[in-house]
Amino acid sequence: MARSVKKGPFIDDHLMKKITKLNSENQKKPFKTWSRRSTIFPDMVGHTVMVHNGKQFTPVYINENMIGHKLGEFSPTRTFRGHVAGDKKAAKK
């Protein structure tokens, strides 16, 4: 279910403070965050955010196409190791 329009998009306060501070100082250095639930705002474009995936921090460079999405969408939490190629048991009938 989508978030209500009257509530507006969500972003953690500490994350917004970091972005406004970096924008006021004209810095583009990467910074770490655990806030995967925060929505990407237009103020964040051009920054590199290190998003935690439960094990390590994944660098995410924010561009215009990411606005409105969540930070967690760009930092996968699970590793896909592939399917077994030689499994013939399921194919028999």
Curated annotation (Swiss-Prot):
Pfam families: Ribosomal_S19 (PF00203). One of its GO terms (biological process) is ribosomal small subunit assembly. Keywords: Ribonucleoprotein, Ribosomal protein, RNA-binding, rRNA-binding. It comes from the Bacteria. One of its GO terms (cellular component) is small ribosomal subunit. InterPro entries: Ribosomal_uS19, Ribosomal_uS19_bac-type, Ribosomal_uS19_CS, Ribosomal_uS19_SF. One of its GO terms (molecular function) is structural constituent of ribosome. Transmembrane segments: none annotated. HAMAP family: Ribosomal_uS19. Belongs to the universal ribosomal protein uS19 family. Protein S19 forms a complex with S13 that binds strongly to the 16S ribosomal RNA. This is Small ribosomal subunit protein uS19. It comes from Leptospira interrogans serogroup Icterohaemorrhagiae serovar Lai (strain 56601). The lineage of its organism: Bacteria, Pseudomonadati, Spirochaetota, Spirochaetia, Leptospirales.
